Amino acid sequence: LIDIQNFAWEGFGSSGNSRVRPLRIECVSAGSGRAIRFFFRDSDKNEIRVARLLKDGLRSDVGEEYVTEIQVNTSEALPVPFIFAALRKSGGMHWDLGDQAVFSGQIDVSNVEGYWTAECSGTMKQVDLAVTTALLSAHLQGVAEITLNNFLWSQSRIKNVDCECIADRGEIEQVWIDRLVRILGCRVDEAYHHLSGSHARSFQRLGFGLVIDSGGLQLLALPGRSGCLLESQGLPVILEPLQTVTLDRLAWLLSGTRPPAVPGTDVTAWLLSVLPIPNAFR
């Protein structure tokens, strides 16, 4: 049992205004194994738990076989870098969302026979779009809120993503808009003006739903927005595509080359390796 009277998470470049709270770390029994719990003493219902369990509670002839489980269950916002630190053992690629990003919701991760599975639902707030797009060839600026209705990972691949993203103000490079129109089939509306190069335009609202599964990619406007994905000065800039597109077009969108080439970058190479296997190849 470890009690830390004053704990605050401050990432590199953070403002230093993190709430200071008492943190408890304890080792507890968990079925056929042990678990380490991380929780704030003033709110013990919100916790991060890392467990190592004997598979099926049995020992085999070749020795003990273990299952690793990582669980996050929190109704209050916890720093995303803090959660990523707990998930580091899973070996996944953790995309930088900024030092101020926070998460509330549920995450369940497990490893059986070397394969990781994960399921997640919840909300991420204060996502720094400049940091999030820093590894890409084109960039965004602003602060976003992302709602994960469902994220499912199995057998080293994404199985399903269903999420929504909203940013009330920011800047978007024109090349993003051009690619969304050319590659994903978004439609141009009255506030669209073609600007050259990487010139950025300000926006008052960016909002979309994204669904990824073996059937392809759907980019959707949010309810009540009349199909609009991006607004500038109160006018629609681009509208949602009329149909689902193939998953390789997501890699094209992020590749940053013209004509689009894949993998193009390390990011898109990784993405292609983990996207769902299309129904046509099953």
Task: Show the residue positions of the predicted features.
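Membrane-proximal interfacial segments on either side of biological membranes
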Residues: 1-45, 50-282
